[in-house]
């Protein structure tokens, strides 16, 4: 139940990691369910 986007256009699911392009900004931040994920950050709920 997480339809939030991981800044790179990929959809981020609970527990899944957001894959991003190498060119994208790499700001690793933890994101909660429903919040936006930064590039390369893990979504933990």
From Swiss-Prot:
Record-level Gene Ontology MF annotations: copper ion binding; metal ion binding
Name this polypeptide is given: Metallothionein-like protein 1A
Keywords carried by this UniProt record: Metal-binding, Metal-thiolate cluster, Stress response
Tissue/organ expression: Expressed in phloem and mesophyll cells of leaves, vascular tissues of cotyledons, sepals and petals. Expressed in anthers. Expressed in root endodermis and at lower levels in cortex of mature region of roots.
Family assignment from sequence similarity: Belongs to the metallothionein superfamily. Type 15 family.
One Gene Ontology biological process: response to high light intensity
Induction: By light stress, drought and salt stress.
Function according to Swiss-Prot or TrEMBL: Metallothioneins have a high content of cysteine residues that bind various heavy metals. Functions as a metal chelator of copper (Cu) and zinc (Zn). Plays a role in Cu homeostasis in the roots under elevated Cu concentration. Functions cooperatively with the phytochelatin synthase PCS1 to protect plants from Cu and cadmium (Cd) toxicity. Plays a role in Cu homeostasis, specifically in the remobilization of Cu from senescing leaves. The mobilization of Cu from internal sources is important for seed development. Confers tolerance to Cd and plays a role in Cd and Zn homeostasis.
